[in-house]
Amino acid sequence: MPKSKELVSSSSSASDSDSEVDKKAKRKKQAAPEKPVKKQKTGESSKGAASSKQSSNRDENMFQIGKMRYVSVRDFKGKVLIDIREYWMDQEGEMKPGRKGISLNPEQWNQLKEQISDIDDAVRKL
């Protein structure tokens, strides 16, 4: 629709006013992301207590298998998952799960455990 307005109005003042409106809209869009950040900072105290409970539960179910690599057992949407995943440190020093990894359901985990000896044999052959 804006294209039709540009075709109808041939005066330069109309296009100038459109560009001013665009600039103002861009400024508003840039300012908008800043507001949620400020709101999150004020509510961190209540969220911080909840996240500390989650992190203590997560720490109990995390088993280190390498540098920044862990096997963890967690509940996701009512389902138990076994994660084998790389982690990274954010700017606050909190560990966050990375993209590299896999989540197994208990059935897949049991199948993997049953095949451990075969996997070990294959590793020895190489």
Curated annotation (Swiss-Prot):
Cellular component GO terms held in the UniProt record: nucleus; transcription regulator complex
Annotated segments matching region Regulatory: 2-50
Keyword Calcium: no
Pfam family, one: PC4
Cysteines joined through disulfide linkages: none
Main location: nucleus
Example of a GO biological process term: positive regulation of transcription initiation by RNA polymerase II
Region (Disordered): 1-63
Gene3D superfamilies to which the protein is assigned, alphabetical: Transcriptional Coactivator Pc4, Chain A
Record field: compositional bias (Basic and acidic residues): 31-44
UniProt biased composition (Low complexity): 7-16, 45-55
Keyword tags: Activator, DNA-binding, Nucleus, Transcription, Transcription regulation
A Gene Ontology molecular function term of the record: transcription coactivator activity
Intracellular or extracellular location(s): Nucleus
Region feature Interaction with ssDNA, mapped onto this chain: 76-100
Domain of life: Eukaryota
Family: Belongs to the transcriptional coactivator PC4 family.
Function per UniProt: General coactivator that functions cooperatively with TAFs and mediates functional interactions between upstream activators and the general transcriptional machinery. May be involved in stabilizing the multiprotein transcription complex. Binds single-stranded DNA. Also binds, in vitro, non-specifically to double-stranded DNA (ds DNA).
Protein name as it appears in the record: Activated RNA polymerase II transcriptional coactivator p15
Organism of origin: Gallus gallus
